From Swiss-Prot:
The lineage of its organism: Bacteria, Pseudomonadati, Thermodesulfobacteriota, Desulfuromonadia, Geobacterales. One of its GO terms (molecular function) is ATP binding. This is Sulfate adenylyltransferase subunit 2. It comes from Trichlorobacter lovleyi (strain ATCC BAA-1151 / DSM 17278 / SZ) (Geobacter lovleyi). HAMAP family: Sulf_adenylyltr_sub2 (MF_00064). One of its GO terms (biological process) is sulfate assimilation. Belongs to the PAPS reductase family. CysD subfamily. With CysN forms the ATP sulfurylase (ATPS) that catalyzes the adenylation of sulfate producing adenosine 5'-phosphosulfate (APS) and diphosphate, the first enzymatic step in sulfur assimilation pathway. APS synthesis involves the formation of a high-energy phosphoric-sulfuric acid anhydride bond driven by GTP hydrolysis by CysN coupled to ATP hydrolysis by CysD. The gene is cysD. Heterodimer composed of CysD, the smaller subunit, and CysN.
Length: 301
C-alpha cells in the first residue's frame, strides 16, 4: 500500500515539539493513557521524543472498572514492554456507591467515574500538566480548544478565556493549583492517526480490527457482550456479527460498527469512504446538546 507520508512527518515533528516543550517547562507532567489508538500514537511519539532515553513522566489511566477486558490486558502489556511507570486511579467513592452505566445513566456515571476520578488523581499527585490524545476533528468543543488548555484550580475549562497560540510558541505559565491539559494530536485527523499507525507499525488494541463478536442491539448501537454484568433486556438477543470499534471507551457506552476491515490497509480504505464521525459510537456524546463542552468545563478530559 503506497501512501504519501510527508504531512505525517510534519505532524509528527509538531507533536514531538509540544511534548518536549511541556517536559522542559512544567515541573510534574503526566501522560493520560486511555489505551485507544490516539493514546498509542501519543505514547509512540513520547518514546521518539526522548529516544534512547525513557520519557521522564509516568502514564496514568483513569480506570472506571468498565473498560473492555482486552483494553486492560493491552494497557498492562504496553506499560511492561516499554518500562513506563503506570499509575491506575479508580474513584473508590464511586465504586463503593455502586455507580454503573446501567443503573445511573451515562451522564452521572461519566461525571463520577471519569471526571471526578481524573480530578482526584491530578490533585493527589499534584500534576501541573497532563497530555491527552484528543483531536480537533473529533467533536465541536474540541475543535475550538487550544493545544495548551488551561484549567482552574478546580480543573474547570473556560472556553471564553483561552490564550493565543502564535506559530509554535506556547505560554505554559500557571498559578499554583492550576494545571494544563496538553493535546499533541490536536491537528491530526482520524485518517492521519491510522496512516501513522500503519507507517510506524504501532501496536493497538485488537478491538479495532473486525472479527465475529457477540453483540446486542441497544439504543440503536451494537454493544459488545464483554462480561456477565451486561444483562439482556426483554426482546434483546445476542448476535454474532463481524464488527470492530472506531473509538474505545467503557464497553456499555461504546457502540461497534459492522465491518470486515481486519487489517490496517482495510481500515484506512474504510476511513477514506466513511461520512460519519468516529464518536457517533460514544453514548456519552449524546447526553444533551453541548454535552462534551459542559463536561470539559466541569473537568473532563
Amino acid at each position: 500500500m503506497y501512501l504519501n507520508m510527508t504531512h505525517l512527518r510534519q505532524l509528527e515533528s509538531e507533536s514531538i515539539h509540544i511534548i518536549r516543550e511541556v517536559v522542559s517547562e512544567c515541573e510534574n507532567p503526566v501522560m493520560l493513557y486511555s489505551i485507544g489508538k490516539d493514546s498509542s500514537v501519543m505514547l509512540h511519539l513520547a518514546l521518539k521524543a526522548f529516544y534512547p532515553a525513557k520519557p521522564s513522566f509516568p502514564l496514568m489511566h483513569i480506570d472506571t472498572t468498565w473498560k473492555f477486558r482486552e483494553m486492560i490486558s493491552f494497557r498492562d502489556q504496553m506499560a511492561s514492554e516499554y518500562g513506563f511507570d503506570l499509575l491506575v486511579h479508580i474513584n473508590q467513592d464511586g465504586v463503593d456507591q455502586g455507580i454503573s452505566p446501567f443503573k445511573h445513566g451515562s451522564a452521572l456515571y461519566t461525571d463520577i467515574m471519569k471526571t471526578e476520578g481524573l480530578k482526584q488523581a491530578l490533585s493527589k499527585y499534584k500534576f501541573d500538566a497532563a497530555f491527552g490524545g484528543a483531536r480537533r476533528d473529533e467533536e465541536k468543543s474540541r475543535a475550538k480548544e487550544r493545544i495548551f488548555s488551561f484549567r482552574s484550580a478546580n480543573h474547570g475549562w473556560d472556553p471564553k478565556n483561552q490564550r493565543p497560540e502564535l506559530w509554535n510558541l506556547y505560554n505554559t505559565r500557571v498559578n499554583p493549583g492550576e494545571n494544563i491539559r496538553v493535546f499533541p494530536l490536536s491537528n491530526w485527523t482520524e485518517l492521519d492517526v491510522w496512516q501513522y499507525i500503519y507507517l510506524e507499525q504501532i501496536p493497538i488494541v485488537p478491538l479495532y480490527f473486525a472479527k465475529q463478536r457477540p453483540v446486542v442491539k441497544r439504543n440503536g448501537m451494537l454493544i459488545l457482550l464483554d462480561d456477565e454484568r451486561l444483562k439482556l433486556q426483554p426482546g434483546e438477543q445476542v448476535q454474532m456479527k463481524p464488527v470492530r470499534f472506531r473509538t474505545l471507551g467503557c464497553y456499555p457506552l461504546t457502540g461497534a460498527i459492522e465491518s470486515t476491515a481486519a487489517t490496517l490497509p482495510e481500515i484506512i480504505q474504510e476511513m477514506l469512504l466513511t461520512r460519519t464521525s468516529e464518536r457517533q459510537g460514544r453514548l456519552i456524546d449524546h447526553d444533551q446538546a453541548g454535552s462534551m463542552e459542559k463536561k470539559k468545563q466541569e473537568g473532563y478530559f
